[in-house]
UniProtKB/Swiss-Prot annotation:
Family matches, as Gene3D superfamilies: Complement Module, domain 1, Laminin, Plasminogen Kringle 4, Trypsin-like serine proteases
Cellular component terms (Gene Ontology): apical part of cell; cell surface; cytoplasm; extracellular space; glutamatergic synapse; Schaffer collateral - CA1 synapse; secretory granule; serine protease inhibitor complex
Species classification: Eukaryota, Metazoa, Chordata, Craniata, Vertebrata
Site description Important for binding to LRP1, residues in chain: 99
The Kringle domain, residue ranges: 124-205, 213-294
InterPro entries membership: EGF-like_dom, Fibronectin_type1, Kringle, Kringle-like, Kringle_CS, Kringle_sf, Peptidase_S1_PA, Peptidase_S1_PA_chymotrypsin
Domain Fibronectin type-I: from-to ranges: 36-78
Subcellular location: Secreted, Extracellular space
Name this polypeptide is given: Tissue-type plasminogen activator
Domain EGF-like: residue ranges: 79-117
Organism this protein belongs to: Mus musculus (Mouse)
A GO MF label: phosphoprotein binding
Domain notes: Both FN1 and one of the kringle domains are required for binding to fibrin. Both FN1 and EGF-like domains are important for binding to LRP1.
Length: 559
């Protein structure tokens, strides 16, 4: 009887856990983990399980209430009213839920985040980067930054839960910031088994130009320019005639906006560019300032390639935002085919190789795609353009490939064509007298074949690292008696090893960029032209020498 009772008790124990079992039990396994998070793309914010938030409804003026449930975002519309106090930065419009205290910011173009505090067009930082509010999230080692709101940073001195986090630019994101006034923007990374700080690879804005030009929309511009597009002189921000205006030196946050006892151009509301108040025909109005954006050529958000392939490495378009893909309509069938690579050198102009256009295609049969990582798969931020015209160098020799350069003008209804973003940007043109040391390491990129015998182009953008050959090694003698002129330069992979491991351009890469880093900016040194095979040991690729064509480029761009 006792044995039977003991068996019954044991069975009950299996069926009904003891009261304190839950203290040590590990119940949270699988997909429904309490660590499940949700990503709200419009605000680029990550939310934890059961967190809720408001967000604007797409293509609607309504607002919806969202909740993170097991990794899924569940939303429904709710009534809202205007916020009782300003909570949004950079000209964002604040709306508050009618029956609870949460709010949502309707952000102007170029700004995202819970409070419109993230500037998606900021591609570099000024001075120490204390006011940098861009989206760079990569450390100098290539490590990805950790979200400032992560619980692993709760004991760190700088995290998104500090009382003054918003002022410091910290929030529910992993973008580089400089909250402690260090030398430049930094972030936390996981390294060698622990969480530590590391400077970011965010590029610095060109020095010496901050007084004459502005970066992004000019929200952080603090120069002394004070003339408008009509050459009118700006009114001081503390002028008595501005009483009652939204943006004056009397605002509580005027210092943060750059407003004060001066008449310098500013952009306190996140408008398209710096502006100021002026008097026109005895009436108070405002005008944009007569300023140009700073050059951000050659700047990028480089991501270290993860996959090695024949001839190079798979890469992302953000590492080579100047890379263009040129397509041409098929002659006898619908659709289009990939033609060549190209390189964006200004908003409306792309350089390529002359030999790509031997068939003299009508301009309306050509298309240029910018911002694409995969050759035939559209990218999220890609930009597509028809061609207004293209110019092949008048002295191009289709036998020797001398003067192998062409210039394509993108079609646009305005003077602005390509819009700068993390995926689209220009490469710098070199100085006329540029002479780089022999064996300087440079980069090329393109959608070409992995090897000469392959029947297919690469599905994804590749990059390769090569070194500039001395002129004494860039001769006919070293290239099997092929003609080599002073308009060409040579570059190749100088490492020892089998041919399969060597980096090089290949068929399909033609017209693409060979860029070298000069003063932390990627500068266009060559245009991919021709070669003997692909990735052969001690056989360099041949490139059009861009410094020889600067006058030709500028003259044709002015026409």
């Amino acid at each position: 009887m006792k044995r039977e009772l003991l068996c019954v008790l044991l069975l009950c124990g299996l069926a009904f856990p003891l009261p304190d079992q839950g203290i040590h039990g590990r119940f949270r396994r699988g997909a429904r983990s309490y660590r499940a998070t949700c990503r709200d793309e419009p605000t680029q914010t990550t939310y934890q399980q059961h967190q809720s938030w408001l967000r604007p409804m797409l293509r609607s003026s309504r607002v919806e209430y969202c909740r993170c449930n097991s990794g899924l975002v569940q939303c429904h519309s709710v009534p809202v009213r205007s916020c009782s106090e300003p909570r949004c930065f950079n000209g964002g419009t604040c709306q508050q839920a009618l029956y609870f205290s949460d709010f949502v910011c309707q952000c102007p173009d170029g700004f995202v985040g819970k409070r419109c505090d993230i500037d998606t067009r900021a591609t570099c930082f000024e001075e120490q980067g204390i006011t940098y509010r861009g989206t760079w999230s990569t450390a100098e080692s290539g490590a990805e930054c950790i979200n400032w709101n992560s619980s692993v940073l709760s004991l760190k001195p700088y995290n998104a839960r500090r009382p003054n986090a918003i002022k410091l630019g910290l929030g529910n994101h992993n973008y580089c910031r400089n909250p402690d006034r260090d030398l430049k923007p930094w972030c936390y990374v996981f390294k060698a088994g622990k969480y530590t700080t590391e400077f970011c690879s965010t590029p610095a804005c060109p020095k010496g130009k901050s007084e004459d030009c502005y970066v992004g929309k000019g929200v952080t511009y603090r120069g002394t320019h004070s003339l408008t597009t009509s050459q009118a002189s700006c009114l001081p921000w503390n002028s008595i005639v501005l009483m009652g205006k939204s943006y004056t030196a009397w605002r509580t946050n005027s210092q943060a906006l750059g407003l004060g006892r001066h008449n310098y151009c500013r952009n306190p509301d996140g408008d398209a560019r710096p502006w100021c108040h002026v008097m026109k025909d005895r009436k108070l109005t405002w005008e944009y300032c007569d300023m140009s954006p700073c050059s951000t050529c050659g700047l990028r958000q480089y991501k270290r390639p993860q996959f090695r392939i024949k001839g190079g490495l798979y890469t992302d378009i953000t590492s080579h935002p100047w890379q263009a893909a040129i397509f041409v309509k098929n002659k006898r069938s619908p659709g289009e085919r990939f033609l060549c690579g190209g390189v964006l050198i200004s908003s409306c102009w792309v350089l390529s190789a002359a030999h790509c256009f031997l068939e003299r295609f009508p301009p309306n049969h050509l298309k240029v795609v910018l911002g694409r990582t995969y050759r035939v798969v559209p990218g999220e931020e890609e930009q597509t353009f028809e061609i207004e015209k293209y110019i092949v160098h008048e002295e191009f020799d289709d036998d020797t490939y001398d003067n192998d350069i062409a210039l394509l003008q993108l079609r646009s209804q305005s003077k602005q064509c390509a819009q700068e973003s993390s995926s689209v940007g220009t490469a710098c043109l070199p100085d006329p007298n540029l002479q780089l040391p022999d064996w300087t390491e440079c980069e090329l990129s393109g959608y070409g074949k992995h090897e000469a015998s392959s029947p297919f182009f690469s599905d994804r953008l590749k990059e390769a690292h090569v070194r500039l050959y001395p002129s004494s090694r860039c001769t006919s003698q070293h290239l099997f008696n092929k003609t080599v002129t002073n308009n060409m330069l040579c570059a190749g992979d100088t490492r020892s090893g089998g041919n399969q491991d060597l980096h090089d351009a290949c068929q399909g890469d033609s017209g693409g960029p060979l860029v070298c880093m000069i003063n932390k900016q990627m500068t266009l040194t060559g245009i991919i032209s021709w070669g003997l095979g692909c990735g052969q040991k001690d056989v360099p690729g041949v490139y059009t020498k861009v410094t020889n064509y600067l006058d030709w480029i500028h003259d044709n761009m002015k026409q």
